[in-house]
Regions:
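Extracellular jelly-roll beta-sandwich "head" domains, especially the C-terminal globular C1q domain
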Residues: 1-134
Length: 134
């Protein structure tokens, strides 16, 4: 059963610095208990529980960079994809179940990008979905 949910996207081209957080300022569906930082890079869950979190990152060309979820600024095990020097990808996606505590903060990060930037092409360069299940 879905208790609460939030969604946000980046629908314009954006330049993301090395190990930068992905801004998600567009098409926001705001949840009752999930708040968004002013720069649209951090999503805070007010109530702890089990959350299903999914993301998609599209780049304009294949990169060796990866994407991952951070919880309170720390990489969450099992929530990363890509980031392997021998593997170039232009679409990175993942979906995980996370046990979160009150006021935990979720961010989407691009990491291990030797070029220093990842260009996210329109119409949807990246999206993040957060669903509270319990």
């Amino acid at each position: 059963m879905i208790i609460d949910f939030a969604y946000a996207a980046n629908t314009g081209a954006a330049v993301i610095p090395v190990d930068g957080l992905v801004p998600l300022p567009n098409d926001q569906v705001k949840a009752k208990d999930i708040t968004v930082s002013p720069d649209s890079t951090k999503f805070t869950v007010k109530t702890g529980g089990i959350y299903q979190v999914g993301y998609v990152v599209n780049t304009d060309k294949a990169l060796t960079a990866g994407a991952r979820l951070l919880v309170n600024g720390e990489p969450k095990e099992g929530a990363a994809v890509g980031g392997i020097a021998a593997l170039s990808l232009s679409r990175l996606s993942n979906e995980v179940l996370l046990r979160l505590s009150d006021n935990d903060e979720i961010s989407l990060q691009i990491f291990n990008n030797p070029i220093g930037t990842a260009l996210l092409p329109a119409p949807v360069g990246a999206s993040l979905r957060i669903v509270r299940l319990s």
